[in-house]
Amino acid sequence: MAMTVHCDIVSAEGEIFSGLVEMVIAHGDLGDLGIAMGHAPLITSLKPGPITLTKQGGEKEVFYISGGFLEVQPNMVKVLADTVQRAGDLDEASAQEAVKAAEKALNEKGADFDYSAAAVRLAEAAAQLRTLQQIRKK
């Protein structure tokens, strides 16, 4: 049996996952992170994208987060997400439409244009599509 660590994924809406996992893979601001038992303690911010959990027995479960923080302590990993969804609950058509709308907003800058808000919307929609692509690869 593989070594496990306790993982919690929570957002403002509440806890979406709590259990033992063999591995947590997340997209940190400085690159991808793979967290397993015995990982050094750390705290880092997370980019929008998938969080992949490898549960006991090798079963994988994927979640989408819109950003947040990851804390690693001995025997514990905690993901504090801005928002979180199970990857299977994402709507690909809505994500593609959001990408198109954000790209259109970036190309049609008006007087009251907020570049950073449009860029954030584009990054989140693109991250949702990446998450959907990742679960298709399973």
UniProtKB/Swiss-Prot annotation:
Organism in which the protein naturally occurs: Pseudomonas fluorescens (strain SBW25)
One Gene Ontology cellular component: plasma membrane
Topological type in the membrane: Peripheral membrane protein
Record-linked PANTHER family: ATP SYNTHASE DELTA/EPSILON CHAIN (PTHR13822), ATP SYNTHASE EPSILON CHAIN, CHLOROPLASTIC (PTHR13822:SF10)
Family label: Belongs to the ATPase epsilon chain family.
A GO molecular function held by the record: ATP binding
Subcellular location(s) per record: Cell inner membrane
Protein name as annotated: ATP synthase epsilon chain
Gene3D superfamilies: ATP synthase delta/epsilon subunit, C-terminal domain, F0F1 ATP synthase delta/epsilon subunit, N-terminal
Binding partners and assembly: F-type ATPases have 2 components, CF(1) - the catalytic core - and CF(0) - the membrane proton channel. CF(1) has five subunits: alpha(3), beta(3), gamma(1), delta(1), epsilon(1). CF(0) has three main subunits: a, b and c.
Tree of life domain: Bacteria
Pfam families: ATP-synt_DE, ATP-synt_DE_N
Role according to the record: Produces ATP from ADP in the presence of a proton gradient across the membrane.
NCBIfam families linked: ATP_synt_epsi, PRK00571.1-4
InterPro entries: ATP_F1_dsu/esu_C_sf, ATP_synth_F1_dsu/esu, ATP_synth_F1_dsu/esu_N, ATP_synth_F1_esu_C, ATPsynth_dsu/esu_N
Keywords tagged on the record: ATP synthesis, Cell inner membrane, Cell membrane, CF(1), Hydrogen ion transport, Ion transport, Membrane, Transport
Gene: atpC
